[in-house]
Amino acid sequence: RDVERSRGLGDVYKRQGMEAACSTPPRNGMEIYTNTPRLRKYRKMILELLLSNHCGECTTCDKNGKCKLQELAARFDIHRVRFDNPKSKPCIDDSSVSITRDANKCILCGDCVRVCNEVQNVGAIDFAFRGSKMKVACSFDKPIGDSNCVGCGQCAAVCPTGAIIIKNDSHRLWKELNQEDTIAVAQVAPAVRVAVAKEFGYNGENVMGKIVAALRRIGFNYIFDTSTAADLTVMEESKEFADRLANGGKLPLFTSCCPAWIKYAENEYPEILPNISTCRSPMQM
């Protein structure tokens, strides 16, 4: 069985010449060289070509400091790109409520296409056109907000650059917090507690108290734990299941907690909508 192959700047396998790791499965008897002067030279040139076709606004990019392309450029000591980019800059696609797509930063690695089609089975994006005109796009080149995207965010999670990012509405938040008559309410999910702890080096610790203190100082009036609302959702769903079971209602009963799952069901499997719970998600509870 072939091993999973990743992007073309990985190892290069050598038999009688150079071959890209992304398209060459390992075979018995192969001699593999991964860090020779010749390979480093070619990798550096490929990186320069990628950078020439990439938006260079790194200091204002949301991925600054976490960008895979930026990391590779530093590793290969690239401080200047020798090639010009003749392409005109495409518009930023901000039509989705969940993500923002910036084709100026796309390096056509295909990770977003793969996770959308093969992992999530949504198929909202794919490669379009060929050659120098190739790009990642929705069907008929529509905005992502008009496609069958469910807003799961997996494409943003695997994107190595800032081509797809989770939509940032913090500017709207600060604007509202500055209004004196605004009552600000925050809700913290368990996953957020873990992510914040990891980000600040508190691995394995409960930082809920620190999060509450920080939110208070920012200007929030009320802070709730999503776990409480999740308990209410479980109670409501249990009651609904018992009622359906006793009265011959539609079974099996599917949860309604995830908005992305609900949209996926609406787009792909509308016949199961009567099986979905009528309870609100914990965020809405």
Residue ranges and their predicted role:
Residues 2-9, 13:
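Single conserved hydrophobic/aromatic residue that forms the stacking wall/gate
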Residues 6, 40, 106, 110, ...:
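Conserved structured core elements
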Residues 10-11, 139-141, 237-242:
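Short low-complexity, flexible loop/linker segments enriched in glycine and/or proline
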Residues 11-14, 26, 36-38, 62, ...:
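Short glycine-rich, polar/acidic loop-and-turn segments at beta strand-coil junctions
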Residues 14-151, 157, 164-176, 183:
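Fe-S ferredoxin-like electron-transfer domains
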Residues 165-285:
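Iron-sulfur cluster-binding electron-transfer modules in prokaryotic oxidoreductases
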